[in-house]
């Protein structure tokens, strides 16, 4: 059996293929109802069905809104607020670098060790890892070997921040931002009756027992 195709046969095959392509390209598809299962060649169903459904999703009508528009993804999805974050209220704190809101809080910087200079394509990953390690170690309080003395230590526990305090209190929160090789930290206080959210937020007291300021945040507002 001859396995070679003659030149005139090649021209006929190309012409036939072009005619088939032009036939389908010139025939407009009005909707999914114009495509029956028996008329679709196996293997091309997702392409043929996806095209009209894409048009129906982008230009929905009253009869198509609902279950049909939810069946197949159109590639454009709206942002959905997680249920755990919805309704928590409070004022969202912007990027720690610009967190000068006037509501209290302090911005500090944890500088990168100049002797450690990672290079290569993973430089930013290594710097971020080092910054996180320094932040974790910064807020770990070492065991005391002597009698505690009266001192102000940001982030330490206080009488008004104990969860079992019936008078309410504050808890210290931190928001971290990696900016040009430095870790920027914004820290502030929230009432202990307020929810703990993933996004940095200022909350107001809901129980009526939390003080306006505590010994942790009294210096966040500057000198009296």
From Swiss-Prot:
One of its GO terms (cellular component) is host cell cytoplasm. GO terms for molecular function: metal ion binding. Transmembrane segments: none annotated. Residues 54-65 have a biased composition (Polar residues). Keywords: Host cytoplasm, Host-virus interaction, Inhibition of host innate immune response by virus, Inhibition of host interferon signaling pathway by virus, Inhibition of host MDA5 by virus, Inhibition of host RLR pathway by virus, Inhibition of host STAT1 by virus, Inhibition of host STAT2 by virus, Interferon antiviral system evasion, Metal-binding, Viral immunoevasion, Virion, Zinc. Zn(2+) 1 binds at residues 170, 189, 214, 217. Zn(2+) 2 binds at residues 193, 205, 207, 210. Belongs to the paramyxoviruses V protein family. Plays an essential role in the inhibition of host immune response. Prevents the establishment of cellular antiviral state by blocking interferon-alpha/beta (IFN-alpha/beta) production and signaling pathway. Interacts with host IFIH1/MDA5 and DHX58/LGP2 to inhibit the transduction pathway involved in the activation of IFN-beta promoter, thus protecting the virus against cell antiviral state. Blocks the type I and II interferon signaling pathways by interacting with host STAT1, STAT2 and STAT3, and mediating their ubiquitination and subsequent proteasomal degradation. Interacts with host IFIH1/MDA5 and DHX58/LGP2. Forms with host DDB1, CUL4A, STAT1, STAT2 and STAT3 the mumps virus V-dependent complex (VDC). This is Non-structural protein V. It comes from Mumps virus (strain Enders) (MuV). The gene is P/V/I.
């Amino acid at each position: 059996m001859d396995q070679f195709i003659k030149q005139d046969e090649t021209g006929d095959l190309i012409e036939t293929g072009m005619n088939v392509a032009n036939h389908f390209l010139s025939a407009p598809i009005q909707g999914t109802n114009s495509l029956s299962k028996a008329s679709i060649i196996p293997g091309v169903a997702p392409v043929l069905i996806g095209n009209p459904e894409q048009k129906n999703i982008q230009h929905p009508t009253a009869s198509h809104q609902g279950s049909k528009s939810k069946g197949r993804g159109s590639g454009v999805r709206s942002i959905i607020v997680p249920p755990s974050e919805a309704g928590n209220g409070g004022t969202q704190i912007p990027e720690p670098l610009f967190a000068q809101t006037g509501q209290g809080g302090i911005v500090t910087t944890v500088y990168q060790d100049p002797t450690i200079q990672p290079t290569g394509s993973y430089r930013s990953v290594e710097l971020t890892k080092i910054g996180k390690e320094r932040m974790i170690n910064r807020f770990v309080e070492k065991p005391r070997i002597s009698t505690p003395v009266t001192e102000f230590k940001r982030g330490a526990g206080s009488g008004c921040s104990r969860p079992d305090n019936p008078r309410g209190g504050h808890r210290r929160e931190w928001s971290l931002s990696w900016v040009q090789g430095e870790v920027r930290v914004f820290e502030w206080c929230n009432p202990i009756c307020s929810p703990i959210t993933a996004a940095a937020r200022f909350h107001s007291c809901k129980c009526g027992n939390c003080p306006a300021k505590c010994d942790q945040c009294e210096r966040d507002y500057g000198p009296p």
